Each structure stands twice: as C-alpha cells, then as structure tokens.
Amino acid sequence: ASYTPSGSAEVLSSTEFGVTYSGVDGLTVGYATGTDGGAGAASEVDNRNAWATYAYGSVTVGYQSNSSDSKVASADKDYTGMVITYTVTDELAVSYGTSEIDYELNAFDQESTSVGASYTMGSMTLSGVHNTHDNISGSSLASADRNVYELGLSFAF
C-alpha cells in the first residue's frame, strides 16, 4: 500500500494498494489499484493492474494487464504484455516478449517485441536483448518506430 499526502509539490493525494497470491506451486497472481491525484483533481488517474506468472520446469510464462482511466478527455491507456522464458541450461536462458499499449486518443496502438538471452559463467553474466517498438505513443510516423539493442555484462562478488 502507498499513500502520498498533498503538500507543496502535490496538489492532491495519491493512494495505491496491491495484493499478491502465490499459494499454488509455480503460480503467482496479483492485482493492484490506485488513484494518482498528484497533478490535481481535474487530471486524476485511476490505475488498475493485474498480473500472473507461472513457472513449470524450465519454462516461465507471464502476463500483465494495466488500465489507466484519466479524468482528462481521451487520455485513457490500456496495456497488455506477455513473456515466455526458457532456461536451456543452468548457464543459458532465452526469452521472448510482446506488449501493446492502446491509446484512447490515437488510432494506432504501440506494439513492442523483445528477444533476449543471457549466459552465466561463474560470477559473470553476459546478456543481450533486441527490442522493436512500433507506433510509439500511438504515432503512425516512421520516426515513431525504434529498434533497440542492449548488451550487458555483470559481475557478482
């Protein structure tokens, strides 16, 4: 649970709470809701978020759905995302994910995909991800599309 009182930097209070349940082996589900009034009552946003992950053997699957309902006209957003991860060996894991954001105001949905892999050897992990994002912020312009490559190297001591 979270509460942000109004003050000199906040016009209105914000309150959020969430619940997570993991009573079934390998399954975790959760729900969170809240009201963000930090920008003032006229632009208050009600947020809802539900998610689930399930791990069975070397496969983990996840799903998430968010909804933001704003008092500002045509500012609502809905998000859905899914991911699957496969642990090939103790050292190697691969993943694939996809997500979509539906903007109430825009005719185009933002769509993203991600492909990643990580390799761990001792205390060192090498990882790489390729992300594609189409129609960022609901724009149909070609400049609103992105390909992103990330490489990571981490050490644990």
Feature locations, PLM:
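Outer-membrane beta-barrel proteins
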Residues: A1-F157
